[in-house]
C-alpha cells in the first residue's frame, strides 16, 4: 500500500510536465514574426499635380485591369485500361495416354424363332377295290326247303349247323349251331374249335343296312366284308372289317348293321359276312 501511495504523485507530476512541454512547443510554432524598425519609405500621390502627358490634372492613371482567373488546365484523360484475357495454358500431352473405354453396346435379345408348321400330309385318294364276284354255294338237296343240316358223332366233336336266307346251305363241324337271316346272301362254312380264341368259322348274313345319304349323293359304291365274332347264345362280341369298300361311310354303315344283327350259336363262332352297296 505504501508503494502505491508513493507512485501515484510521481505519475501525476510526470504527466503534468509532459503537458507543459507540448504547450511550449505549440506556442513556439504559432508565434508571430516581429517587424524590425528601420527606414520608412513614404509614397507620394503625384496625380494632384497634373500629368506630364497633357492630361488634365486630377486625372489619375488608368486603373489596372482586374486579373482574370487562370483557367485550370484540363485533366488528362486516362486511356481505358485494356482488359486482360485469361491465358489458357495447355499442358503437353503425356507420353503415355490411356485410351478411353468405349461403352459396350447393349446386346439386344434375339427374337425367338417360331417353329415352322409341319406340312400336312396330302390325303391320297383311296383306290376303289375291284369287285369280286360272289361265289354261289353249290346247291345240295336238303331234307326241308331253305334249311341245311349236318350230323356227326358228338364224341368226335361234331355238331349241327343250320342257316336260312335267300340262298345258302352248307355244313359245319363243331359243337352248337348257328343261324343267319336277312336280305343279303349268306354263306355257311366249316370251322374247328369251341373257344373265344379259336372260334368256329361260318358264313352268315345280316339285314341290308340303310344306304348313307351322302354316299348316294357322291355315287359311292362297293362291297364290305365283315368278320363278326358271336358268343354262345348269339351275342355279337366284336365286328372287324376284313375288306373295305373304299369309303368310310359305307364301312361304318355295314359295321353298325352287323352289331345290331342277330345270330344263333351254341359256341363261339366267327361269321364272315359280305355286304354289298350298289346304286341302281
From Swiss-Prot:
This is Protein TonB. The chain crosses the membrane at residues 6-27. The keyword Ion transport does not apply. Residues 196-280 form the TonB C-terminal domain. It is a single-pass membrane protein. Residues 28-280 are periplasmic. Residues 1-5 are cytoplasmic. Residues 90-143 have a biased composition (Basic and acidic residues). GO terms for cellular component: outer membrane-bounded periplasmic space; plasma membrane protein complex. InterPro entries: TonB (IPR003538), TonB-dependent_transducer (IPR051045), TonB/TolA_C (IPR006260), TonB_C (IPR037682). Residues 165-184 have a biased composition (Gly residues). Its main location: membrane. One of its GO terms (biological process) is transmembrane transport. It comes from Neisseria meningitidis serogroup A / serotype 4A (strain DSM 15465 / Z2491).
